Amino acid sequence: MDNELPIDSNMLYNYLRLSPADELYHYSYATAWTWLINMTGKQEPTEADITEELLDLFVGFVYDRFYYLGSSAIRKYDPNHMVLGSRLLTGFMNQPWVLRFAGLHLDCLTFNWYGEWDIPPEKLAFVSQNANAPFMITEFYTKGMDSGLDNTRGAGWVVKTQQERGDFYQCYTLRLLECKNVVGWHWFQYIDNDPDPAVIYKEVNGVLVWKDQSSVDANKGIVSNTHEPYTDLVNSMTEINKNVYKLIDHFDAKDAQTATAEE
């Protein structure tokens, strides 16, 4: 269902200011004004009637419609597959109405969650409580300067070594394992980006392929461009991955002890 959709608290203003004469957007324009009329109870509301609460509610309204239409179509024509949403960006984790409607329509929410060494438990709890659904992290990574790559591209933070990348992986995923609603994660990505930032087009099997400029010259992979594993990173990943279920049992037992002590 698309990927990394935009989040804008001024979405309502943007729709209201569309041109009603524009064939591409006149339905969106009319829908926004009809919504505002219904929400304010006024026949001729103005932008002065818009509150912060209405701005948040309209964002939820848009995503409710998007997820309803998308999930309904997928379930009609592809009923045997889960609906995983749109890989929400980090900014969505504090949008309660988006989370609630996503949880209503999706089988599992997905997030590309950057900007945290480990995600604070209160943020994970906020997503869990509002979505009331399982979710997974579909992108996260750091880049190591010891790779020899420039590392100026991409959303992941920069660290000094591959061991520090491994430390980040362990810290980040241990926090995820503490959260009962998290069902998995996906490191971005398997192989490093091309080290040549000047290459925008590259011939692959006789076909000219365009490369996104965010996908060059960065140590995102668990293997290099020559398919050599970053051993320190891989070993740290393996240590966590082989013990996932034991770690879940540990955190569950810890939660049970805390709950018993509070009774």
Located regions from the model:
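Active-site clefts of carbohydrate-active enzymes
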Residues: 40-56, 90, 130-172, 179, ...
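Loop/turn elements at helix/coil->beta-strand transitions in domains of secreted/extracellular proteins
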Residues: 78-83, 104-107, 131-135, 178-184
